[in-house]
């Protein structure tokens, strides 16, 4: 039997993305139960990844069950990511990708469970939107689209788009279109691009999705 999958997310945008893009793709691979879980930061249940302990609590709550018929993963941004354990290990890495990979390892070591797969998006959700100009075409005017195309042309892999605060993917979109609405437009843009194009361009993201499929299929 196929395993269930829970993905801990930091916000509504990621929650929608799991529902509207990741889940339908996984259904093609016969993984039918895919549930995004918003990080609980307070009594109100609002999302946001501001404290590692909140994420850990949510993961451990899901993993408390002894059952082996599910996998728990996470989908959070590297940009503005709060400190995760073992800073001495990940902070010394010189590249962002090195830091992210080490941070994922440190989280894995901290939440010791074979059913748990950490994933941190380099550099943030919006990077995925730069996989193609297709998505922006519907929502941006000609001048805005041209600016987006220049950014797309500068990076083979959108996951490399820089994380200096003003260079972060979301900041770049806001600089082009001031009223960009992350939750609504972000996912509509992603839907326009299509999941296969995002997978093709964003190699770390693709590796994560492929790993989830493999683990959900393992007996």
Q: What is each PLM-predicted segment?
A:
Residues 7-16:
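Catalytic nucleophile-elbow at a beta strand-turn-alpha helix junction centered on a G-D-S/GDSL motif
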Residues 4, 8, 45, 115:
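Short, flexible active-site loop motifs that bind/organize anionic cofactors or intermediates
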Residues 41-54:
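N-terminal beta-loop-helix "entrance" segment that forms/cooperates
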Residues 1-2, 15-41, 56-219:
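C-terminal accessory helical subdomains adjacent to catalytic cores in phosphodiester-
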């Amino acid at each position: 039997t196929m395993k269930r999958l829970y993905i801990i997310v930091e916000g509504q945008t990621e929650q929608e993305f799991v529902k509207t893009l990741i889940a339908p793709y996984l259904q093609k691979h016969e993984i039918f139960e895919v549930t995004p879980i918003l990080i609980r930061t307070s009594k109100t249940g609002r999302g946001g990844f501001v404290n590692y302990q909140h994420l850990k609590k949510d993961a451990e709550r899901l993993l408390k069950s002894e059952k082996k018929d599910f996998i728990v993963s996470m989908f959070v941004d590297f940009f503005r990511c709060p400190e995760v354990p073992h800073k001495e290990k990940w902070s010394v890495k010189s590249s962002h990708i090195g830091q992210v990979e080490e941070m994922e390892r440190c989280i894995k070591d901290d939440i010791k469970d074979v059913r748990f797969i950490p994933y941190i998006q380099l550099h943030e959700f919006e990077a995925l939107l730069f996989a193609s100009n297709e998505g922006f075409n519907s929502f941006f005017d000609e001048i805005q689209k041209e600016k987006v195309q220049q950014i797309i042309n500068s990076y083979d892999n959108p996951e490399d788009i820089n994380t200096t605060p003003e260079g972060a993917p979301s900041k770049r979109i806001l600089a082009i279109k001031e009223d960009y609405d992350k939750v609504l437009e972000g996912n509509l843009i992603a839907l326009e691009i299509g999941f296969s194009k995002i997978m093709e361009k964003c190699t770390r993201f693709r590796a994560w999705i492929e790993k989830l499929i493999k683990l959900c299929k393992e007996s």
